[in-house]
Amino acid sequence: HISAVGFGLYCQLLKRSVARLKGEKQPLLVDTELRLDFVKLAPSDAGESGAAYVPVDYIPGERLRVAVYRRIAEATERDEIEALQQELEDRFGKLPPAVARLLAIADIRILSATHGIQLVEVRNRKLIIKRDGDYVKDSARFASLTASDPDGQLEELRDTILNLVA
C-alpha cells in the first residue's frame, strides 16, 4: 500500500483512520502535489543551491533523521512544522539551509492543502497552481517568480499562496 500512495500520504491516511476509530476530529489530508524545478530533494544533491534534506552532519543518527522525515510527512498543520523547527534548533543547533528549505516546502504543502490547492508547480520560474480542478491565473496567464535563489523563490511562493487565499 505504501508504494501505491507514497509514504507521506500513507502516514496521513493511517493517522486519519486512528483518529476516526477514537472518535476524534480527523486531521486534514495533505495531498497537494508539489513540483518545484529549483529544489533538489536527494541527499546526493548536497552542495546544490536548492538542496532540501536532512544532512548527516546535522543529525548523525539515521533513526533520528528518519524520524524527522516521518514527522514532516505526517504533519497536517503549519504549527507542527513550526514546532519541529523549534525542536530541531533546540536539540541540534541552527538549521542548515537544506533543512530550512525542507521545512519551508512542507509548510507550503500544508498551506496549499488547507486552501484546496491540488497542484503547485514551478517550471522555469513560471508558477502553475491548480485549485478546485481549475488553473489559477493572473490576468489570463500564469504568474512568474522573480527571486533568483531557491530560498527567495520558496518565500515568494508561500507569499503568493497566502495572497491568493486572502
Language model: regions and residue ranges:
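Accessory helical-bundle/CTD segments and flexible terminal tails appended to RecA-like ATPase motors
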Residues: 1-166
